[in-house]
Amino acid sequence: GGNLDVQIAAARIDQFIGALGTTRSQLFPQIGYGADASRAQASRIGQPPLPPGADATFSLFQASLGASWQLDLFGRVRRQSEAVQAQVFASEQAQRGVVLTLVSNLATSYIALRALDRQLEIARATTANFEKTAHIFDLRYKQGVVSKVEVMQITSQVQQAKAAIPLFEQAIAAQENLISLLLGRNPGPIPRGKTIDQLLAPAIPADLPSTLLERRPDVLQAEQNPVAANANVAAARAPYYPNISLTGLLGTVSTTFSDLFPGPSRAWRAGGSIAGPIFPFGAVRGQDAP
């Protein structure tokens, strides 16, 4: 088991780390392969017509290795990577904040549990003392030392003290269930450690530097939000500039499988492309809008 909030925060970190890897992969060439085998029949009356005696049915085998690389000359991918990196760091700080909150809640809940334990001990001890006193009053009543009214008063106090015991027991069970929930476990008893008297708050030095505030997870998380926003703005402006790509293909083509890999069957292609907007009619500007 485990605390659900912590699990959600950890899953969010994994999500951004995966997105960071996907974004950064665009900085490198993309390499792939392909293979194809087919059987076809050509038209005998097509253009150009088949020569007399030629077989219209033929096989075609192809194998290729291709690569493409979109050059990030204007920083679109780098800015996107910066934005996702900031989101990764922010999500890590968010998880730290969740963990710190969980630890704080657990500590507070455990202290409350030990306080209830102490109250239950006091209630049981008080009940035992009242019962002893009631027994003494009963003996004295039989001896004619005290009145019936006094016996009834002490008996009422015994009943009141006893009535508090199940209330504390119910409160303890509810507090144990709360701690189990924070721990991500099924409801059940919580092992005890130090008593409430032994739980001392640590001494906090009076001269702590204010720079400690900069280490707070919520502060560090908030610092990354504008970093991610600025990087996203820069990435959104990249479509104003042209996209430049390089492509290459190396392969073989043959009508027979046995001739697929010898030198004469080899084929290759290399090229580049450039494309960019001229009249996007506000599409790019809309992406760039805050």
Roles of regions detected by a PLM:
Residues 77, 86, 93-208:
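Periplasmic alpha-helical coiled-coil/stalk elements that build and connect Gram-negative outer-membrane
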Residues 33-39, 246-252:
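Transmembrane beta-barrel strands of outer-membrane/channel proteins
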Residues 45-53:
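Flexible, solvent-exposed loop segments that connect beta-strands
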Residues 2-7, 14-29, 43, 64-82, ...:
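A glycine-/polar-enriched beta->alpha junction
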Residues 168, 217-218:
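Metallo-beta-lactamase
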